[in-house]
Amino acid sequence: MIEAERTPGFLHLLQMTGGASWLHMCIHHRETESFLSSVTGLDKLIAAAMVSEDTRSRLRVHGQGVMVLLKAMHLRADGVGHPEDMVSMRIWIDERRVITTREEDVDPILELAEDISQGRGPATPGDFLCDLIEEHLAEVSEQVEMLEDGVNLIGGLLVQHQTEAACPSMANTQTAISGFLRHLGPQRAVLGVSSFSVQ
């Protein structure tokens, strides 16, 4: 996949300790889709899904590989995630390679890239997917804890009969919970199947 370095959407090509390669590309270049289908040999439908901006969480097994699409946190400067800021992580894995594409940087991808660059991190594509999901779920858990803290604060205000003070927080928290459920709810089935697929 060395040819990718001459493609406008190229971001990095890293080698895992087990010998598999990881190609990471940006979807904001029209050449990315054609490169994925013509040079890497991905099925045209898979290549199209890997560059689509509007994706829903899903998993598709194709031949000897697996495509996983997930919604990830895109944290703001204050470390808080918002449903409207969530972006897609698009991952293709097969026996010898990982291909990912992005519209915006997300921490799980950046952290894995740093680990692999330093000779650490996952050794195989299956390990890569497991580590990526683990990092992703850690970020989700942190945001859920923040929401729980907000709910507890609202509960305290209501107990003290400070309804007027609680109302704005109630509306914001309800909106956030609904938004996260819309994006994260479909991932339950995807993550269950993906954990089985890489075993």
Labelled PLM ranges:
Residues M1-S197:
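Peripheral, non-transmembrane regulatory/ligand-interaction domains of membrane transport proteins
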